[in-house]
């Protein structure tokens, strides 16, 4: 028996991974481009996870950073340039993995530039949490996902 089930069986739970899947399904996205700050091995696990969930990964790029304490120091302007110049193929959306990566403030700008949905770990966590507790999750300034209701 799962500890959560014995403690609070009706608990609503989300993770960055499950929230990303929920958001991609809500938006009817099938093809994604994935960006991570992780080392290659962990990056490849992220890609495999989405492939196992039946998403077509059109492209992938990663920064090869080992430590969360270094990931949060990545400059958002640098991220914007990297993501703008990344070949996303014919992806319908870009998923940016990692809750430590400072990407929330550039999502809307990226969506406008790339003309694609841009989803990040923190963004989908916020969206899915609000969705699960039945709160209005229409929030401006953090991407088109929040306008999908």
Model-derived features: positions:
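Active-site rim beta-loop-alpha module in soluble metabolic enzymes
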Residues: 41-97
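Catalytic alpha/beta core domains of metabolic enzymes, predominantly
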Residues: 79-80, 98-104, 114, 120-121
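A polyampholytic, Gly/Pro-enriched intrinsically disordered region
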Residues: 30-41, 77-87, 136-149
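Short, flexible loop segments at boundaries between secondary-structure elements
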Residues: 65-68, 116-138
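Short, small-residue-biased leader/transition segments that mark boundaries at the very start
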Residues: 1-3
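Conserved beta-alpha
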Residues: 6-66, 146-147
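Short hydrophobic/aromatic-enriched beta-strand-loop microsegments
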Residues: 33-34, 54-60, 114-122, 137-141
């Amino acid at each position: 028996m799962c500890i959560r089930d014995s403690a609070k069986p009706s608990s609503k739970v989300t993770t960055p991974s499950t929230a990303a899947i929920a958001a991609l399904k809500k938006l009817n996205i099938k093809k994604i481009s994935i960006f991570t700050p992780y080392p290659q091995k962990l990056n490849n696990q992220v890609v495999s996870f989405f492939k196992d969930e039946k998403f077509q990964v059109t492209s992938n790029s990663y920064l090869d950073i080992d430590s969360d304490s270094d990931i949060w120091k990545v400059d958002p302007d640098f991220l914007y340039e990297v993501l703008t110049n990344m070949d996303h193929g014919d992806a319908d959306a870009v998923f940016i993995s990692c809750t430590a990566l400072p990407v929330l403030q550039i999502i809307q700008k990226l969506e406008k530039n790339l003309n694609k949905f841009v989803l990040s770990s923190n963004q989908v966590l916020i969206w899915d949490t609000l969705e699960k507790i039945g709160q209005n999750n229409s929030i401006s300034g953090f991407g088109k996902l929040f306008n999908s209701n």
